[in-house]
């Protein structure tokens, strides 16, 4: 029986609508609307598309969106100064610097310059550490979005055998922590892992994030497994495809995400949720200081 499709586009639309309702309620109570600053360095075509989608989603949800499009040759110091000003800006609750950055700018330095309470990407070491320690904090958008998708399947995650393919700081590592926190038994596969196919076959849940189109073949997927394809790759033909052979895998999986229309929309929806959470957290900090 073909897998059920985890429609991230539809679920994300509902999540964005809920954020919009919450923003409207804030304004009715006399609170300011949440504010997000998005910084784009250079004009990487893919990054520019992602940034446009994020800004549009903010506007639709009633979130204040400020755009900072910087030249590709901007110095690291100038970028850090911009972040410092946004850290101090009372109208801004979230700061997002679109990655990747040009080679002359150190990404980790930039990430660590963002105030952790405004780090809506969830990449700051403080927020990563809080995730590892199972403490409240701003969580990386894509893994948090994946957990929302999994919740919509109604499947009990506790005790499941999960395989995460990829160990990036953006997806693989925080995804592993999210699944550990859900009490899964997690195996991480990377470029030095042996017998990857066999490890995947044994999994109840597979999360693929390696950036290699079709790497995970259909016969790697165990019968009834849940497959989350985070990969998004553009082929020479212009077609977008994931890391999983969708057609073959969908004949074995119980649930599977499409590419596009699976995880991508959830990442954007989660960014809005994080921005709303950041605004609420700052409200609490302000009230506590009074």
Swiss-Prot record:
GO terms for cellular component: cytosol. Coiled coil: none annotated. Keywords: Amino-acid biosynthesis, Histidine biosynthesis, Hydrolase, Methionine biosynthesis, Multifunctional enzyme, NADP, One-carbon metabolism, Oxidoreductase, Purine biosynthesis. InterPro entries: Aminoacid_DH-like_N_sf, NAD(P)-bd_dom_sf, THF_DH/CycHdrlase, THF_DH/CycHdrlase_cat_dom, THF_DH/CycHdrlase_CS, THF_DH/CycHdrlase_NAD-bd_dom. It catalyses: (6R)-5,10-methylene-5,6,7,8-tetrahydrofolate + NADP(+) = (6R)-5,10-methenyltetrahydrofolate + NADPH; (6R)-5,10-methenyltetrahydrofolate + H2O = (6R)-10-formyltetrahydrofolate + H(+). NADP(+) binds at residues 166-168, 191, 232. This is Bifunctional protein FolD. The gene is folD.
């Amino acid at each position: 029986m073909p897998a059920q499709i985890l429609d991230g586009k539809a679920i994300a639309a509902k999540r964005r609508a809920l954020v919009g309702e919450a923003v409207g309620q804030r304004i009715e109570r006399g609170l300011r609307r949440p504010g997000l600053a998005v910084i784009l360095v250079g004009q990487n075509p893919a990054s520019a598309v992602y940034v446009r989608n994020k800004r549009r989603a903010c506007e639709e949800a009633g979130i204040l969106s400020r755009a900072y499009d910087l030249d590709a040759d901007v110095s690291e110091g100038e970028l850090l100064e911009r972040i410092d000003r946004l850290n101090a800006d009372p109208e801004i609750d979230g700061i997002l610097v679109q990655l990747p950055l040009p080679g002359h700018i150190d990404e980790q330095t930039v990430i660590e310059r963002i105030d952790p309470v405004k780090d809506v990407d969830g990449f700051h070491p403080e927020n990563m550490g809080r995730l590892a320690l199972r403490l409240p904090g701003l969580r990386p958008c894509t893994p948090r979005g994946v957990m929302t998708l999994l919740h919509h399947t109604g499947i009990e995650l506790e005790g499941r055998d999960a395989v995460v393919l990829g160990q990036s700081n953006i997806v693989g590592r925080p995804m592993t922590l999210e699944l550990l926190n859900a009490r899964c038994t997690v195996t991480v596969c990377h470029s030095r892992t042996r017998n990857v196919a066999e490890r995947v076959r044994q999994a109840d849940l597979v999360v693929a994030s390696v950036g290699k189109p079709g790497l995970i073949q259909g016969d790697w997927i165990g019968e009834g497994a849940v497959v989350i394809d985070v990969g998004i790759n553009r082929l020479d033909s212009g077609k977008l495809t994931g890391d999983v052979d969708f057609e073959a895998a969908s004949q074995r999986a119980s649930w599977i995400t499409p590419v596009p229309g699976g995880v991508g929309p959830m990442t954007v929806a989660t960014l809005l949720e994080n921005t709303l959470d950041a605004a609420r957290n700052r409200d609490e900090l302000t009230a506590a200081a009074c």
